[in-house]
Every structure is written in structure tokens, then in C-alpha cells.
Amino acid sequence: MAAQSGRVTQVIGAVVDVQFEGHLPAILNSLETKNGGNRLVLEVAQHLGESTVRTIAMDTTEGLVRGQEVTDTGSPIRVPVGEGTLGRIINVIGEPIDEAGPVKSEGLRAIHQEAPTYTDQSTEAEILVTGIKVVDLLAPYAKGGKIGLFGGAGVGKTVLIQELINNVAKAHGGYSVFAGVGERTREGNDLYHEFIESKVNADPHNPDPSVKSKCALVFGQMNEPPGARARVALTGLTIAEDFRDKGQDVLFFVDNIFRFTQAGSEVSALLGRIPSAVGYQPTLATDMGALQERITTTQKGSITSVQAIYVPADDLTDPAPATSFAHLDATTTLSRSIAEKGIYPAVDPLDSTSRMLSPLVVGEEHYAVARQVQQVLQRYKALQDIIAILGMDELSEEDKLTVARARKVERFMSQPFHVAEIFTGSPGKFVDLADTIKGFKGLVEGKYDHLPEAAFYMVGTIEEAVEKGKKLAAEAA
């Protein structure tokens, strides 16, 4: 059957209406036209009446004119997959945007796929060690699970994601896919160059045969129209699914999943849907479910996904972050009040949760230490009002000791990052799980009550804290 062609009848920002004679293209099909010499891809979103489809443009529509010819490709948007994508930057429609020539792909795959069936899914529970103390102890990540990083603007979500890529890619050596959804282009550019410098990826312009690229980058950043931002997460996921189906354990990073929802909401109004709570699209839960249900572990391989989730105005009850919560195995909440104390990563130890923190998965000792740490911090939180009104002197001896230990625990949760070496000047630390448990266990049992608080700030293992304590004592003397 020859490719169907139609004509543009109306352009409203990112939404384009196309009229076809006879057979209408299916919903989610991709249509193509030329705009200023460039290929413009439109995705069918609605059928209007007998002969018109309403589509969402994947690029800017400036310069489109009514009557212009549009061709139906007969399938959804298809993107290159396989090892040829590693080390490359591609956009939502699979075109390379790193000026390093065409992508050597092993074939094309449609970005809209069915989620794996129940029978295909794997149910094993295994922990993914990240080398970040506060995460591994209190909200451990599941291998093949979904992890959400919640936080307002500027509390360190992107830095934490970069550290995870660095630690986990180096520790387990698998492939990663990074989807930049509606975030700053500058950060995407920095990430690309950091990957080349840290040898996670080879430089496509200047290949070094000793470096094998481990991460594919897919970007649809803030300057892109909403169509691209609403679909780029699916493009990244399609590449990750292909690696998984070939038996790989893949890491899939999305920065930022809120922008995926935001783009959907921008398009929704243009498509004429009546908005729901807080102006979001009525299909919010469906859109989120369609993406999240595909991120799963099958009998063949696993996808472990880490998603940064921007929280508008620090309000966790906003429909966008609240809808994401339902899908996650672990949540890491970054708190502004902790960042203000200078404690980085600014992970809130009482607000971060994980399905994996169970004695059956992590073992009795780990579970007991994690609960003791949370107990000490919870008690400290309860005493803060009394301290603010009456001061430390009014507390009982037992409470004074609890406060002192809690402050040390808080500081011991900070840790120098490899990716932050550039601006902190201190070398990054990867802390093994056994060392993390040992350190916090000693702290809550009172083994280190004699050391000053400052000894625990920005160190890796407890041995480093003891060394730092000795140094501080020598300097004070």
C-alpha cells in the first residue's frame, strides 16, 4: 500500500491538524513533513471527524503553512537501538545531535510498546549497593526496581544522579541510558563532557580504543516543544528495553520525570481536553502508568530506573509527584532544611523509604541498625521544639546524649562525591555496605561519644572519622 499523504489544515503552537482523503492514519502513528529543509515528525493524537487527525509536533512549527503535504509513515516513531547508541546523544526521533555522524544502529524499534506480561516478569529481591551511606543504610535500592529522587529546585537531584551513574556504572559495569527530559541544556552538556572525562563514555569525535562507551544519552531539553519533552522518556526507555531483552542489567536515568508530566499538561490543553486538579491533564495517571509499567525486570534482564522528580513549591501532595509515588520501590527525598545545614547529599533520613528495608531482604543486623538510627533521629526531631524554647540545658542527661548522637549521625550521613570533586576539592568516597553498617552501629551504640561532631562531617568510613577526630584534637591542643 502506497504511503498515505494529507495536507496541513491548522497549526496551533505544537498541535497541527492534518486532513487526509480516505483512510486515516492510526493513533500514535508518526507523520512526516518538511519544514525549512528539516524533517518534522508529527504524532497522531486524535481523530477529528471523518477526515482530519490532530497531531503533536516533535519540533518547532514556525514556518509551517496550511496546505503543506504530510506523509503517513505507517508506524509509530522508530528510533535506533543497540550498542551503536552508546556514547552518542540522540533526540526524541532518534536523530544524532552530537555532530558525530549517523548512529550505527542494530535496527529500529517503535517507541510505543506493550509492558511485559506478568509471566515474563521476574520477582527476585536483591539490593543494589550505591556506595552512598545514607541511601544504602536507610532506603536501599532494589536491583531492577524504580527509585524516585524527590526534591525542590537546587537541593542536589542532578548531582546525586550523576554520582549514581558514576558509582554504579563503574561498580557493576553494565550499560546505562540517560534521558534528559525538559531540564537545562547546560547540565546535559556538562554531563556529556563529564562522562568523556571520567571514561564512562568514549569521545565520538576523538575515539580512544581503550575506552568503551557505557551510556547512551537521549535529550529533549527545556527549549524543546512539549511534544518532544512528552515523548523523549519513551525514546530512552525503548533503548533500555532493547538492552534488557538482550540479557543486560540496564540502568535507566530520567531527569526529570515531572517535566514529562508538565509537557503532557501543555499539550493536553491544546488538544482540547478539560484539565483536572491543579490544571494537569485528565490522563495524568494513565500517561504515568504507560511509562512506568514498561520499566521492569523480566526473565531476560533488568532495568533499574532512577528518576529525579521535581516537587513544585516543595509540595509532595501536588498531583504530579503524588502520581509518581505509587509506582516506586524506593524514594529518596532531598530536603532543603538539610541542605541549609551544609549536609550533602541532603537526603532526608526520616522521609526516604524503601520496600527493600526488611529483615528478609537486607538481614537482621542491617535492619536493626537502620531502625535504631531512625529512632535516634526521630527523638532528636521531637526534642527540637524544647531546645528552641528552653535551650539544651533544660534537657535530661539521657536526652542530651541522644541529641549529641543524633547530630553526629546527621553529619556522618554527609559524604564527598566523586562528581562534586571539581567544586568541593575533596576526593569522592565509595563506602561498602558492611562499612556503612559498622559505622552507624558504633555511633548509635555510643562507641564514638568521645569524638567531636566535626570529625564525622564529609568523611567516608568511620575509620576516617576517627582519624579526623585525632587530627582535630591535635590541632586544638
Curated annotation (Swiss-Prot):
UniProt catalytic activity: ATP + H2O + 4 H(+)(in) = ADP + phosphate + 5 H(+)(out)
Residues that hold ATP according to the record: G151, G152, A153, G154, V155, G156, K157, T158
Gene Ontology cellular component list: plasma membrane; proton-transporting ATP synthase complex
Molecular function, one GO term: ATP hydrolysis activity
E.C. numbers: 7.1.2.2
Name of a matching Pfam family: ATP-synt_VA_C
Protein location: Cell inner membrane
Family: Belongs to the ATPase alpha/beta chains family.
InterPro entries listed in its UniProt record: AAA+_ATPase, ATP-synt_VA_C, ATP_synth_F1_bsu, ATPase_a/bsu_AS, ATPase_alpha/beta_chains, ATPase_F1/V1/A1_a/bsu_N, ATPase_F1/V1/A1_a/bsu_N_sf, ATPase_F1/V1/A1_a/bsu_nucl-bd
Function: Produces ATP from ADP in the presence of a proton gradient across the membrane. The catalytic sites are hosted primarily by the beta subunits.
Primary location recorded for the protein, binned into one broad class: membrane
CDD domains to which the protein is assigned, alphabetical: ATP-synt_F1_beta_C (cd18110), ATP-synt_F1_beta_N (cd18115), F1-ATPase_beta_CD (cd01133)
Membrane-protein topology: Peripheral membrane protein
Keywords, ordered alphabetically: ATP synthesis, ATP-binding, Cell inner membrane, Cell membrane, CF(1), Hydrogen ion transport, Ion transport, Membrane, Nucleotide-binding, Translocase, Transport
Subunit-structure text: F-type ATPases have 2 components, CF(1) - the catalytic core - and CF(0) - the membrane proton channel. CF(1) has five subunits: alpha(3), beta(3), gamma(1), delta(1), epsilon(1). CF(0) has three main subunits: a(1), b(2) and c(9-12). The alpha and beta chains form an alternating ring which encloses part of the gamma chain. CF(1) is attached to CF(0) by a central stalk formed by the gamma and epsilon chains, while a peripheral stalk is formed by the delta and b chains.
Name by which UniProt lists this protein: ATP synthase subunit beta
PROSITE patterns: ATPASE_ALPHA_BETA
Superkingdom of the organism of origin: Bacteria
